[in-house]
């Protein structure tokens, strides 16, 4: 299987395990950060399924200071997919907490907000997608618990799917599959750095966070290939 089809393969495995068909009767919300994983996931869902897709971005305004950089990546990549893919819905929200530490776990916030969106637009989703993988037991349990709690008075509850968990556990190989499974234009639009510095009209990556190190390893490997 070529790298370009790795994400499609992961989606197929995910659907088979959870009895989904990928058809237009299935309603899904994609939690979208503008990073490499969520950008590739959204493109592949639009490309390889007929699911009714709603995309939601949370602008996380915290001590890491990446909110503006991510917002630009979200704007650029969503506009690209609006022009080059089938129709989908988009919404966004802001979570702001300026303290010494970011505070809390991203997955818990993502699943909480997914169900808030469901209530706000009066739409029952079958699936909540996130582009994460290797989610720790504690974080996964906390996030799933929040999702369950927010479905207390609902007749149905969406299933949380993280398709990239079906890919290889070898980090670099998985990254290559995610990266190469989207168009070249989108590869130039996503944002990864957790602690960027704003300079003039742009942003400079820190080069030290785990996301920057992942991107550096990916670039080196692709250059060697």
Q: In which residue ranges do the predicted regions lie?
A:
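Nucleotide-activated chemistry modules centered on ATP-dependent adenylation/adenylyltransferase
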Residues: 2-225
């Amino acid at each position: 299987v070529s790298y370009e089809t790795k994400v499609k393969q992961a989606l197929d495995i995910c659907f088979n395990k959870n009895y989904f068909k990928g058809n237009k009767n299935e309603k899904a919300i994609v939690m979208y950060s503008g990073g490499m994983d969520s950008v590739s996931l959204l493109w592949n869902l639009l490309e390889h399924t007929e699911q009714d897709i709603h995309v939601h971005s949370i602008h996380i305004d915290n001590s890491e200071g990446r909110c503006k950089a991510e917002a630009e990546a979200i704007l650029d990549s969503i506009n690209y997919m609006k022009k080059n893919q089938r129709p989908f819905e988009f919404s966004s929200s802001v979570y702001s907490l300026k303290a010494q530490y970011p505070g809390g776990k991203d997955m818990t916030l993502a699943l909480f907000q997914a169900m808030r969106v469901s209530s706000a637009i009066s739409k029952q989703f079958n699936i909540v997608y996130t582009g994460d993988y290797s989610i720790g037991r504690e974080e996964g349990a906390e996030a799933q618990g929040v999702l369950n709690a927010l479905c207390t008075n609902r007749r149905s509850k969406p299933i949380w799917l993280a398709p990239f968990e079906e890919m290889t556990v070898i980090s670099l190989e998985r990254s290559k599959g995610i990266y190469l499974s989207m168009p070249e234009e989108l590869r130039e639009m996503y944002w990864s750095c957790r602690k960027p510095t704003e300079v003039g009209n742009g942003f400079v990556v820190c080069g030290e966070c785990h996301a920057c190190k992942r991107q550096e390893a990916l670039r080196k490997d692709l250059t060697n290939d």
